[in-house]
């Protein structure tokens, strides 16, 4: 089942939101506010999660609060990869969460955390164990990124070489499984920490790994899964059939579904990271997906959605 709707992914990361098009993030805040209200109208019980921050930046939260966005979301989220590209040590995880909690009382989830096997499989295996130790009890949801390595053929957009996120080549080696599906050393370590640790795994359009991934997730004892439904992909042929197949395959998990990626023909710039010309269209997409996969129109909320997110 879908347990939460996430609005965009890493909005303060150039790889997912173009700061040239929207240098003060006012367009993002407006778009996300519209989407949050649209989700609320379709299902008032479904928690709305602000796309996970990467890097973890309390000043960015204050900026969005200034635009009024935080009044329309129920959960904040952060992403961290301290052994690979963050400018802080892995042992600082509790402090990084405290920085966000110091500026907002909203529930806080860790919707991506990972360690790559780029340097050595043993480093990643140690990272799984240490991450579980550090984050245990500190967040209601902790999603390991990811089940599979990224396909090496994919392109990647990075930031300045001195900024967090610059070592993007490591991003392709975050999986517990290699691109060909063979297990890494970290897989067995991860299984020791489920269901407290969940998984974040994106499935690309008509991803042939879907059934195999579901089998692995069940074998590992995963309960909480984060994935995405791409607004850009919704314009591909037979997109709804693919979305239906994906959601049906994942029905046994508690799914946080992420809505993001601008269709090129709808962006201010022809790129999936661009702000859309008409943000209302993103809100419509979110509403349509919630109505299809997590319907709740007409339901009366007896508790704030934040309580369902705790």
Language model feature labels by segment:
Residues 23, 120-126, 138-139, 143-204, ...:
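Aromatic-rich peripheral "rim/lid" segments of glycoside hydrolase catalytic domains that contact
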Residues 1-3, 9, 50-52, 59-97, ...:
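Aromatic- and acid-rich polysaccharide-binding/catalytic face
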Residues 1, 57-67, 125-132, 204-219, ...:
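Short, acidic/polar
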Residues 7, 44, 72, 170-172, ...:
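Residues that flank catalytic or metal-binding motifs in active/ligand-binding sites
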Residues 39-46, 68-72, 102-105, 137-138:
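Short helix-capping segments at alpha-helix termini
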Residues 101, 129-132, 136:
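Generic hydrophobic alpha-helical scaffold/packing signal
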Residues 12-15, 53-62, 81-93, 116-122, ...:
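Acidic-and-aromatic substrate-binding clefts and catalytic sites of carbohydrate-active enzymes
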Residues 1-56, 214-310:
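Substrate-binding cleft and catalytic face of glycoside hydrolase catalytic domains
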């Amino acid at each position: 089942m879908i347990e939460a709707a996430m609005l965009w992914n890493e909005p303060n990361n150039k790889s997912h939101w173009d700061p040239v098009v929207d240098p003060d993030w006012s367009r993002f805040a407006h778009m996300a506010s519209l989407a949050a209200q649209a989700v609320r109208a379709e299902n008032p019980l479904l928690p709305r999660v602000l796309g996970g921050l990467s890097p973890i930046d309390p000043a960015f939260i204050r900026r969005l609060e200034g635009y009024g966005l935080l009044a329309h979301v129920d959960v904040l989220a952060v992403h961290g990869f301290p052994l690979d590209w963050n400018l802080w040590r892995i042992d600082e995880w509790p402090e990084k969460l405290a920085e966000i909690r110091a500026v907002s009382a909203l529930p806080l989830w860790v919707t991506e955390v990972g360690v790559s096997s780029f340097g050595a499989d043993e480093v990643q295996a140690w990272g799984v164990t240490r991450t579980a130790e550090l984050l245990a009890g500190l967040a209601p949801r902790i999603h390991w990124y990811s089940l599979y390595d990224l396909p090496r053929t994919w392109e990647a957009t990075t930031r300045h070489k001195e900024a967090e996120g610059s070592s993007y080549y490591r991003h392709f080696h975050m999986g517990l499984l290699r691109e060909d599906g063979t297990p890494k050393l970290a897989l067995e370590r991860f299984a020791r920490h489920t269901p407290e640790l969940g998984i974040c795994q994106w499935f690309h359009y008509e991803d042939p790994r879907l059934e195999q991934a579901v089998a692995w997730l069940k074998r590992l004892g995963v309960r909480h899964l984060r994935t995405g439904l791409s607004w850009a992909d919704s314009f591909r042929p037979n997109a709804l059939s693919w979305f239906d197949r994906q959601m049906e395959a994942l029905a046994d998990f508690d799914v946080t579904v992420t809505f993001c990626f601008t269709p090129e023909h709808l962006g201010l710039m022809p790129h999936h990271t661009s702000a859309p010309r008409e943000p209302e269209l993103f809100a419509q997409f979110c509403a349509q997906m919630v109505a299809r996969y997590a319907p709740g129109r007409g339901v009366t909320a007896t508790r704030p959605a934040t309580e369902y997110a705790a």
